[in-house]
């Protein structure tokens, strides 16, 4: 479960909309920052190919910018709406994978 689920939705929305959030200035979405867990690896495996390619490109650009100690021009920052949609999609897939893993564990017991 994501930490975002524990926080009030209004706080999460205001956090994602604020311009001081550095990940947006590098073109990343919030879900791009998730730790690489076993469940997330399965989620990435299930993503459509074009979505996965876009995510990989965002990560490569962010790594390059980080090494150069630069930020994107404001016109190229990540969009709030697309960020929210991508994060919701990843959360939905993650919940589904976790339910499947719980079901598998219950059959093993």
Curated annotation (Swiss-Prot):
Membrane topology term: Peripheral membrane protein
One BP annotation, GO: mitochondrial electron transport, ubiquinol to cytochrome c
Chain segments annotated as transmembrane: none
InterPro entries linked to this entry: QCR7, QCR7_sf
GO CC terms of this entry: mitochondrial inner membrane; respiratory chain complex III
Gene3D superfamilies (alphabetical): Cytochrome b-c1 complex subunit 7 (1.10.1090.10)
Assembly notes: Component of the ubiquinol-cytochrome c oxidoreductase (cytochrome b-c1 complex, complex III, CIII), a multisubunit enzyme composed of 3 respiratory subunits cytochrome b, cytochrome c1 and Rieske protein, 2 core protein subunits, and additional low-molecular weight protein subunits. The complex exists as an obligatory dimer and forms supercomplexes (SCs) in the inner mitochondrial membrane with cytochrome c oxidase (complex IV, CIV).
Known function: Component of the ubiquinol-cytochrome c oxidoreductase, a multisubunit transmembrane complex that is part of the mitochondrial electron transport chain which drives oxidative phosphorylation.
Record-stated family: Belongs to the UQCRB/QCR7 family.
Official protein name in the record: Probable cytochrome b-c1 complex subunit 7
